[in-house]
Regions:
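Short glycine/proline-enriched turn or capping motifs at secondary-structure junctions
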Residues: 13-17, 110-111, 115
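Short, charged, surface-exposed hinge/linker loops at domain edges
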Residues: 5, 46-97, 101-103, 107-114, ...
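DNA-binding alpha-helical recognition surfaces that contact promoter or target DNA
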Residues: 42, 101, 119
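DNA-contacting interfaces and partner/effector-binding or oligomerization modules
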Residues: 1-59, 64
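Short loop/beta submotifs within extracellular cysteine-rich repeat domains
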Residues: 125-126
Length: 134
């Protein structure tokens, strides 16, 4: 099964999200757009289904693929909308105003800042995983 990376992002200054993937085995690229990360993913998946139908009509065999989604910071907070920007910013020690700018796509974090944000989110996930509820 071919593993395909789908990039979900919102460019600085854009209102819509995009989701893009390239399926090398059939030399096809698919782009989805939407006002949310979920909508962009759904649009991309619909485009992939349409592409598979077109390829079948042309007699091209399409094997199943495994899609792995990658997100920029803004798309991550939009897709996982239960993640609180203020809470994450407190956890990792970044100004909540700056985090909101990253989440809304007004600014892009540096590579180092992005790594710090991802590390903080993973730290929060570990804390939640270890929580005992009675």
């Amino acid at each position: 099964m071919e593993k395909v990376i789908a990039r979900v992002e919102r460019e600085v200054g854009e209102k819509n999200f995009s989701c893009y993937m390239k399926v090398k085995s059939v030399n096809a690229s698919v782009l989805g757009l939407g006002n949310t990360a979920n909508a962009a993913i759904a649009d991309m998946l619909q485009g992939w289904n349409d592409t598979k139908e077109d390829l079948k009509e042309d007699g091209i065999e399409v094997s199943p693929i495994e899609i792995e989604y990658t997100f920029d910071i803004g798309a991550l907070f939009n897709y996982y909308d239960f993640i609180n920007v203020a809470g994450v910013s407190r956890e990792i020690g970044i100004s909540s105003a700056v985090m909101r700018q990253y989440a809304t796509g007004v600014r892009r974090p540096s590579k180092e800042r992005k790594e710090r944000i991802v590390k903080g989110i993973k730290s929060l996930a570990k804390k939640m995983e270890m929580a005992k509820v009675y």
